[in-house]
Amino acid sequence: MSKHSEYWDTRRDKEIRQTLSELRALADAGYFEGLQPQPAVPEDLKLQSLVAAQLSKGAVFARKVQVLKPMDNPVGPALTQFMTQLLVRDRTEPYKQETLKKFEDAVGQVRILFGKIVRGEIASNAIIRSIVASFLDTFMKDRNLLLNLAAFPQTGPDYLYDHSVKMCLFSLSLASAAGYSRSQSIEIAQGALLADVGMMLIPERIRLKRGKLNEGELFEMRKHPILGLSLLEHVHGLSEAVLVIPYQHHERISGSGYPDSRSGQAVSRFSRIVSIADVFTALTNQRSYRESLVPYQAMLSLLSMGGSGHLDGEHIRQFLRTMSIFPLGSLVRLASGKVAKVVSPNASEFTKPVVSVLTNESGAPLGRFDIVQVDLAASDEKIVEALPHHSITHGVLDGF
C-alpha cells in the first residue's frame, strides 16, 4: 500500500468515526424517526471497450489527471476571507427580486450556452466566466440567499439546465468552505456548470424517460462524461483543472463510479466537490421516475455516502456546516406547531439553524411583516419535523 493510500484510508476512517458519532447523536435526538429508506448507490457499469476505443481522447485525458492532481489543493488567500453575509433585515424587496431574476436568467443562459457548445459556436470561455462571475459577486455578500434559491425544487420535465445552475452554486459553496481561493473557486464553479453538457448528446427519449432506465439506457447515459469532455476540448480558455470535472464528476473515491472506476487520490478534489453538489441537487429535485427527497433526508444520504467511502467525507462535513442538517431553504415544523424556513446555518450546532417563522401554531400563514427570525441555538424552540416544500403555500423568497 502506498503512503498516499495509507493517508487516505486513515483520513477516511477518522471521517467515518466522526460521521457515525454525529449520526448517533442525531438518532438520540429522534431525528431519524420516520425517515424514508436511503437511496441505494448505483452498481458500477463500466463503459464497454468499443465505446472506450471510439472515445480514446477521454481515456488519454484521464491518465493526465495524476499529473494535474497536486494543482487541486487550496492555493492563495481563501475566498472566505473576503466574504460577508447580509442579514434578513438588510435585504430589500428589489434586491431579492433582482437576485431571483439573476438565477432564472442564468438557467436560460445555460440552455443557450449548451446548445451553442454542441453546435460548435462557442469559441472561448468568456460566456461561461460571465455566468459564474455574476453569481460570485452575489455569493460574496449573500451566500444564504443564493443557496436558498438553489434549494428550491425545480418544476418541469427537462431538469438539465436548472440542475447545472444549482450544481454550480452548491459547488461554489463547497469550494469556499474547503478554503479555496477566488480563482480556484471560479474554476470549480465553471466545471460544475459544464459538468452535464455531455447530456445534450444523449437522446431525449432516454434522458427524459418516465420511469427507471434499463441496462442499455443506463449504459448510454453513462457516456455523458466522455461526451462532455469531447465537446469542451474545443472551447478555448478552459483549464485542464476545469475540464477534469465534467469527466470525473461521476467517479467515486470508493472506485464504484464511472467512466474509469478511479478511486482515492486519483479522483481530483475539484471533481469530488462537484460530485457532492451533483448528488445533493439530484436528490432534492423531482425526476420523472421518482419524487424528490426532503433536503434533510438528502443531507443524511450524503452523510451515509461519506461514511461508506463513496463520497468525500471531509467535504461533506464542510457542506453540513455551511448548510446545516436542515439545509438552507428547508421547511421545518417547530415544537410549537409553527412552520418555519431555514434561513441561516449554525456552524457550531448544525441541528439548530436560524429560521424564519412563516405560520402560527395552527398553520395559518403569517403576513409578510409578521414573519420573525428565531435563532434556535439561543431559543427553547426546536425542530421536530422536516417538511417537503409543498407542505405550505410559500414563495422561494418568503422568510428571506
PLM regions with names:
Residues 1-160, 359, 370-400:
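Non-catalytic interface/linker regions that flank or bridge core catalytic/transmembrane domains
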Residues 3, 8-9, 284-286, 314-400:
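Metal-dependent nucleotide-binding catalytic modules
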Residues 108-109, 157-188, 227, 264-266:
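Alpha-helical phosphate/pyrophosphate-handling elements in metalloenzyme active cores
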Residues 111, 133-140, 151, 168-172, ...:
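Amphipathic, well-packed alpha-helical segments that form the structural scaffold of globular domains
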Residues 136-140, 157-166, 197-200, 240:
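All-alpha helical catalytic cores of prenyl diphosphate-utilizing isoprenoid enzymes
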Residues 145-152, 188, 194, 200-208:
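Short, conserved phosphate-binding/catalytic loop or strand-edge motifs used
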Residues 167, 187-201, 219-316, 325-327, ...:
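Alpha-helical scaffolding flanking metal-ion-dependent phosphate/phosphodiester catalytic sites
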Residues 206-214, 293:
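Post-HEXXH active-site segment of zinc metalloproteases
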